From Swiss-Prot:
Component of the 66S pre-ribosomal particle. Residues 178-188 have a biased composition (Basic residues). GO terms for molecular function: mRNA binding. Disulfide bonds: none annotated. Residues 1-13 have a biased composition (Low complexity). Keywords: Coiled coil, mRNA transport, Nucleus, Ribosome biogenesis, Transport. Required for efficient assembly and nuclear export of the 60S ribosomal subunit. The gene is loc1. This is 60S ribosomal subunit assembly/export protein loc1. Residues 1-68, 127-188 are annotated as: Disordered. It comes from Emericella nidulans (strain FGSC A4 / ATCC 38163 / CBS 112.46 / NRRL 194 / M139).
Length: 188
């Protein structure tokens, strides 16, 4: 409801309000509103001088950037001039470069020497194992030869003393004197 005035005290007039409502709620048609004509914006050709000029970007110094120094090969005392082409020479002092080179070479030679030492040790171990195996084989052969000789000697002693008694004893009692298993040796 609309606020009431002092003179009207509770009475409202329908005519006055309807006029006010008409003015407030009236629509403005968009067809009748005049707009200014659109302005044409011409783009400049890329070959124009103003387009060809490159804006110079600001170059920051290393101190301003405050970047951490990572992946650097250069020694502590050497500072590479900025903008210099990267190459194999990184040091003005050849003595410092040679000392670094010598240190790296010594490290690599140490690794190679350790590999050679390991190879020698392994070869010595293999040689010792080979000698042990040969010694075992020769020991077995000697043992076998001794057994052969003892058997031959026992046969000679039995045959030379009394051949008749031994033949008779072998036919009568084929069992060996010891109660255990009979040992048999076959030679190829």
């Amino acid at each position: 409801m609309a606020p009431t005035t002092k003179g009207a005290k509770g009475k409202t007039s329908a005519k006055g309000e309807s006029k006010n409502n008409k003015v407030l709620g009236s629509k403005v048609s968009k067809k009748n509103v005049k707009r200014p004509p659109p302005k044409e914006v011409k783009s400049k050709a890329r070959t124009e001088q103003s387009q060809l000029k490159k804006t110079k970007k600001r170059e920051y110094s290393e101190a301003e950037l405050d970047l951490p120094k990572l992946n650097m090969i250069t020694p502590v005392g050497v500072v590479n001039p900025k903008g210099k082409k990267k190459g194999k020479t990184f040091c003005d002092d050849p003595e410092a470069m040679m000392t670094i080179f010598a240190m790296v070479n010594a490290e690599k030679e140490g690794q190679i020497e350790s590999k050679i030492m390991k190879a020698r040790q392994l070869e010595e171990i293999r040689e010792a194992k080979r000698k042990e195996a040969e010694a075992r084989q020769s020991e077995k052969k000697n043992k076998l030869e001794n057994a052969k000789e003892s058997i031959r000697q026992s046969r000679k002693h039995k045959g030379g003393a009394s051949s008749a008694k031994s033949n008779k004893a072998e036919t009568e009692s084929p069992k060996p004197k010891s109660g255990g298993k009979k040992k048999s040796v076959a030679f190829a």
